[in-house]
Amino acid sequence: MRLRVLWVGKSREEWVKQALADYATRIRRYAPLELVEVRDEKGAMAEEMRRRECERLEKQIPPGATLLLLDERGEQMDSPGLAAYIGKQRDSGTADLVLVIGGAYGFSDAFRRRGRLLSLSPMTFTHQMVRVFLLEQLYRSFTILNNEPYHH
């Protein structure tokens, strides 16, 4: 199963770039992984920004991919739950699992209906932090699936 993580906007902070690179290297021991940044929209009304950003995200999704969208209104799961979800996708023959982090105003309603919604926490985090948290949880999921001693 191939993993693709999409997000809106550039990773600007050097520590974020380093953390993303570190977790990407770790994850690639278990599965092919691609990280894709799409340009954020500026100077438009919120709904128009969502629409344009989601159009850009849409172009990065392989046909037939399974989508997991990070959304504050999404389902919350613990780390073993996320690992179980990823394992189920892998074991059921999912070719492409795409995880998507939206822009500052989230996803359009139409885009939100395309995938399963996941919330990392009831708290609000910066988009930069969420990228790191998501990759860490992906890595943790693979260590759980492989019975490795990272998750206690």
From Swiss-Prot:
Pfam families: SPOUT_MTase (PF02590). It catalyses: pseudouridine(1915) in 23S rRNA + S-adenosyl-L-methionine = N(3)-methylpseudouridine(1915) in 23S rRNA + S-adenosyl-L-homocysteine + H(+). InterPro entries: Alpha/beta_knot_MTases (IPR029028), RlmH-like (IPR003742), tRNA_m1G_MTases_N (IPR029026). S-adenosyl-L-methionine binds at L70, G102, L120, S121, P122, M123, T124, F125. Belongs to the RNA methyltransferase RlmH family. Its main location: cytoplasm. It is found in: Cytoplasm. CDD domains: RlmH-like. Homodimer. GO terms for molecular function: rRNA (pseudouridine-N3-)-methyltransferase activity. GO terms for cellular component: cytoplasm. This is Ribosomal RNA large subunit methyltransferase H. Its EC number is 2.1.1.177. Keywords: Cytoplasm, Methyltransferase, rRNA processing, S-adenosyl-L-methionine, Transferase. HAMAP family: 23SrRNA_methyltr_H. Specifically methylates the pseudouridine at position 1915 (m3Psi1915) in 23S rRNA. PANTHER family: METHYLTRANSFERASE, RIBOSOMAL RNA LARGE SUBUNIT METHYLTRANSFERASE H.
